[in-house]
């Protein structure tokens, strides 16, 4: 058997990131051949990664990297939040975002083939990370945004990277772009404007809002409060010219019935129409950026605030770690038992 030195073990560990015992075993198996030992480490790493492939990785971090007029945002998952706070994991996330920004891949398949700063492919980096960290580490998704010289990136990460936002703003400055990114992190809009909402989605959301009104009305009835009416519309997309014209006619009829003189109608109608628009765009307010009240100035919507500073949002991406992933629920005893088996 070859005589394995501490220097060889150290060199192999620095090259592969393997643990002390794994490095020593690989060198023994390779009879001191460093190149063969590296191959053994990688082979065993792939085997470990394969065993963990079916595990659910729903924790992790987002990463953002800005390089001139190109920026990338990524989500990288681990099985536990503890590992997500590991420095090796954080480095992997940051290097992934950098690699994506510089490579500008079209999809995950192209992304996995890109070369990381370490010289290995992104896919190899994740196989090796799974082996050395001891949990399933997976590259989930990414987005690449580009801007012109006159536009600004707004990048923001909340809760240590649990939520990541990247936005492109026309006009204003970098501070405004970051504030918009912070708003997006807090209010989680799905799209920029009502024009991007699917009609079926609007109908479903409107039905949910009316279901909530029904529940509220049950409580109101118990204390003899009048029932709230159902919402007929939920989005600007549903408010056609005919609908708006009819709403104005209804307001005029209401004012006439109340005996309000026609000479003051022009002062009353705009406010009532604004209220009509507010009451009938609830789906927009919950799901579209421009219709939301701006967190930095809640007297205005985001759209109104941007207009006041002569700016506009070109695009945005918001990633929240684990969203859409069904997490496995285990009690503490089961978790400990599972760890003892591994």
From Swiss-Prot:
Could you list this entry's UniProt keywords, alphabetically sorted.
Cytoplasm, Elongation factor, Protein biosynthesis
Q: Does the keyword Kinase apply?
A: no
What InterPro entries does this protein's entry cite? EF-Ts_dimer_sf, Transl_elong_EFTs/EF1B, Transl_elong_EFTs/EF1B_dimer, Transl_elong_Ts_CS, UBA-like_sf
Q: Which GO terms describe its cellular component?
A: cytoplasm
Signal peptide location: none
Tell where it localizes.
Answer: Cytoplasm
Name recorded for this polypeptide: Elongation factor Ts
Q: Which organism is it from?
A: Lactobacillus delbrueckii subsp. bulgaricus (strain ATCC 11842 / DSM 20081 / BCRC 10696 / JCM 1002 / NBRC 13953 / NCIMB 11778 / NCTC 12712 / WDCM 00102 / Lb 14)
């Amino acid at each position: 058997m070859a005589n394995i030195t501490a220097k060889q073990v150290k060199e192999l560990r620095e090259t592969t990131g393997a643990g002390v015992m794994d490095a020593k075993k690989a060198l023994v198996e390779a009879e001191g051949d460093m190149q063969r030992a590296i191959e053994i480490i990688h082979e065993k790493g792939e085997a470990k990664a394969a065993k963990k492939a079916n595990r659910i990785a729903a924790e992790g971090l987002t990463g953002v990297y800005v390089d001139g007029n190109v920026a990338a945002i990524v989500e990288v998952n681990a099985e536990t939040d503890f590992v997500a706070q590991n420095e090796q994991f954080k480095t992997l996330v940051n290097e992934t975002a950098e690699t994506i920004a510089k490579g500008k891949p079209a999809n995950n398949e192209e992304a996995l083939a890109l070369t990381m700063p370490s010289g290995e492919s992104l896919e190899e980096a994740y196989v090796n990370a799974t082996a050395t960290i001891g949990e399933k580490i997976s590259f989930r998704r990414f987005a690449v945004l580009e801007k012109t010289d006159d536009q600004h990136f707004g990048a923001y990460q909340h809760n240590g990277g649990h939520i990541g936002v990247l936005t492109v703003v026309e006009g204003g400055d970098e501070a405004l772009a970051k504030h918009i990114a912070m708003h997006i992190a807090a209010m989680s809009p799905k799209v920029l404007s009502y024009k991007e909402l699917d009609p079926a989605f609007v109908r479903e959301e409107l039905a949910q809002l009316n279901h909530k009104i029904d529940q509220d009305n049950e409580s109101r009835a118990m204390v003899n409060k009048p029932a709230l009416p159902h919402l007929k519309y939920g989005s600007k997309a549903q408010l056609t010219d005919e609908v708006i014209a009819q709403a104005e006619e209804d307001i005029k009829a209401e004012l006439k019935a109340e005996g309000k003189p026609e000479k003051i109608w022009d002062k009353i109608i705009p406010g009532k129409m604004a209220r009509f628009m507010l009451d009938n765009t609830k789906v927009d307010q919950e799901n579209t950026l421009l219709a939301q009240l701006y967190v930095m100035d809640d007297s205005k919507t985001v759209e109104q605030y941007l207009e006041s500073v002569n700016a506009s949002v070109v695009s945005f991406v918001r990633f929240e770690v684990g969203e859409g992933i069904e997490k496995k629920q285990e009690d503490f005893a089961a978790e400990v038992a599972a760890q003892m088996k591994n």
